[in-house]
Amino acid sequence: MKSYLNLKEEVWDRETCSGCGACVSVCPTENIYFKQQSPVQFDCDECACIIVPTENGESPISAEFCKVTLYDVNCGACYNACPRTKERHIFNLEKVPGRVIENYKAKSTLETKNIQSGGVVTAILANAFDEDLIDGAIVMMEDKWTMDPKSYLATSKEDVLKTAGSRYNWNVPILEVLKEAVMVKKLNKIAVVGTPCVINAVYQMMATNNDLVEPFKKAIRLKISLFCFETFDYDKMLKKLKEVEVNPWDIKKMEIDKGKLIVSTIHGNVFDFKIDEMDEYVRKGCKVCRDFTGISSDISVGNVGTPEGYSTVLIRNKWGKGFFDRTVINGYVSVEGEASIDPVISLSKKKMERKDIEF
């Protein structure tokens, strides 16, 4: 019988946690937290429950409420939802960039401020809400002043438009709001937008036969992956930016291009940092990820292979095609032929060179 202890041994202690938040959401006893959400922020001297995480810990922690370890009750939900365990279901990564039935160079026609890289994801979600194809979307919300990221549950088109422009350069446990969506708000047509590790966690949920995960897998309707080579620790990156006197509210755009992290400010200044020299700012869990595009998604979107202001859109199955086609037909997205797929393949192969997790 699996418990969080198996997850801790195989993932947390080995520093391969992706930080996706899946384990937090599916835990029925709310036993698992990331340090920012810990219900107790001090060491407990009255019992053995010291649940304050280490200062630089990137993995979740246990509040010692696990029903497997306390009462020998069958669970294992957290283990079965994790994309980094020994028993994870691995989508075939060898053929990059995965199954693609159609690819497009596209951009949103929505008149919305701050839209990033063509705004196609925002447009797909906005149309899906308008047509009642979804009743919720799990996305990232970014404070426009501090750039502090958080998981956000959008329940309307207006909510989605508020998140436009949020940068997924920061790691945030996006799936942590899945429990609220499914168990509290009883949503059952949910879209999930995230980096490949997040989408791979959803794939784990879809593949498991654990009854406790069943409500979550049934509620997810659409998976949209964003191209990602790696994400950065928010606190560490802010310190790095302060070294070059860049405040978070001055940042207009952050992107990775040609081996560099490029930061553009509202004042017209551009700073670039070599990715090879940014290792200490990258989440440790990112270093074992080999998926650049989110192969297990329905739709993958990024800005590689298209010019400024456009998105590269990879349609992976008929399900994703249905959502995208309706978005185009309804005038939310403009398509201008195919994207250049070679740069996507090149970066996918480069990321595949990383060493896989070994047990």
Locate predicted features:
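Short loop/turn hinge sites at secondary-structure boundaries
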Residues: 15, 70, 184-185
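Alpha-helical architecture
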Residues: 19, 46, 195-196
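Iron-sulfur-associated redox domains of electron-transfer enzymes in respiratory
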Residues: 83-359
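Catalytic cores of large soluble enzymes that bind and process phosphate-bearing ligands
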Residues: 19, 70, 74, 112-117
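Iron-sulfur cluster-binding cysteine motifs and their immediate structural context
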Residues: 2-5, 9-12, 22-96, 294, ...
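Non-catalytic accessory regions outside enzyme or core folds
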Residues: 2, 9-12, 18, 22, ...
